[in-house]
Curated annotation (Swiss-Prot):
This is Uncharacterized protein MJ1471. The keyword Membrane applies. It is a single-pass membrane protein. It comes from the Archaea.
């Protein structure tokens, strides 16, 4: 026979069990939501770096950076990166800081390695009948190389386009919980 005390005990056990189940579901659901958010941010970062690599923007930005045109490189990338809060490094040097005080508790890290020729450019062959040298400075275009005052006084003064070596550059993107 079931009496009211048995019903009260059964109801209490059921309520306690439902409370534990609800807490468990809420905890797991919050973890799941965080994972989905992180995965979305990661996919957005991968897509951004992929587009920048495919259309040549990343290569242009790295070359501008190594031609000491940091502001041009920064402007080019800022126009093309559709993220709110991020840090972008080129070879461990911070180029863009758009963290704006956002903590990095929900951040993701995307690394792109570009193999390119950072020393490619216009150089000046200069000298006279006794010696010939190649300039250490490199230039973005022929006119800059030709008109560089340091080498104008030599008998031999000729801009040439050279590729000295090929190396890789690391471009790192930290996305901070957008």
């Amino acid at each position: 026979m079931i009496n009211s005390v048995d019903l009260a005990i059964g109801t209490a056990i059921l309520l306690i069990g439902m409370a534990y189940w609800t807490v468990s579901i809420v905890e797991h659901n919050n973890n799941y939501v965080d994972i989905v958010k992180s995965d979305y941010i990661f996919d957005k970062g991968i897509s951004t770096m992929e587009h920048l690599s495919e259309d040549g923007t990343l290569q242009d930005a790295v070359l501008l950076y190594y031609f000491d045109r940091v502001n041009d490189s920064k402007k080019l990338l800022e126009e093309r990166i559709p993220l709110k809060h991020y840090l972008l490094y080129i070879d461990n040097n911070l180029l863009i800081n758009k963290s704006n005080g956002v903590n990095n508790s929900n951040s993701v890290y995307i690394l792109t390695v570009l193999t390119l020729n950072r020393s490619e450019g216009w150089y000046v062959i200069y000298g006279n009948e006794d010696f010939v040298n190649i300039s250490k400075e490199r230039f973005l275009d022929y006119d800059d190389a030709y008109n560089y005052l340091k080498y104008r006084n030599y008998d031999i003064h000729m801009p040439v386009y050279l590729s000295k070596n090929v190396s890789s550059s690391r471009v790192e993107l930290y996305i901070l919980g957008n």
